[in-house]
Amino acid sequence: MYDFIALGCGLIGKFLVTELSNLGYKTHVIDLKIPAELKESSLITFQEGDVFQLVDDLPKSKVILNLLPGSIGEIIRPLLICRGNDIVDLAFTESEPTMHNQLAIENNCTLLWDVGIAPGLSNMLIKKEYNRDSGIKDVTVKVGGNPAQPDDDWSYMAPFSPSDVIEEYTRPARIIVNGEVKTVDALTDLHSITVSDFGTMEAFLTDGLRSLLGSGMGSNMREYTVRWPGHIQKFIDERNSGELDERKLLEE
């Protein structure tokens, strides 16, 4: 029998399942297609197919890892809660998972959401600092997964679901200003920063505060995504001119 059930094994899911097996944990993976290297592990069992057709047959006693793209993970989330599974949720969804709090209570389950690097680890570090100093005033998070060198095109390759990257660029960003939550357009406050060992890069606002928004831990909070210079301006220019082909970007 396995220790965890992983729904999805894309860029992030494949990495996490591999790490769990390296630590000696047994994981059952469900996705439309399972990478060959995962199939070779003696600690990994798998089912290839539609997660919505297979989820009802899974044991309710196991922790489920929601590693699906945001649009799919958002739909599966309440179904998992109603089953009573405890859930570790990485799906970057537009809706707030807190909307399911009462449903989770009624089904005696726990949902840990946005548990990636940022949001996720960044939120934990901010909470740790808040506890250590008995309060903080200003918080700025700057995060980005980028290639080591820029190129002549986008200077980027998605480290997680490409559709979620586009969501990150188009979803309004929520920030905290003087203790109040404000909503601004994503990609605004574009500015240059210096990154150690890499030089000049660019940062812009995105909706990454998430669980920090209602925490009351800081008077001013913002999260910025970091990219190589020119990347986001290329996105903005193609979007504004109508030349942006999201389907082509997802295929690339």
Question: Which positions does each model-derived feature cover?
Answer:
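Conserved N-terminal Rossmann-fold NAD(P)-binding element of oxidoreductases
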Residues: 4-8
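N-terminal Rossmann-like NAD(P) cofactor-binding module of classical short-chain dehydrogenase/reductase
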Residues: 62-67, 87-89
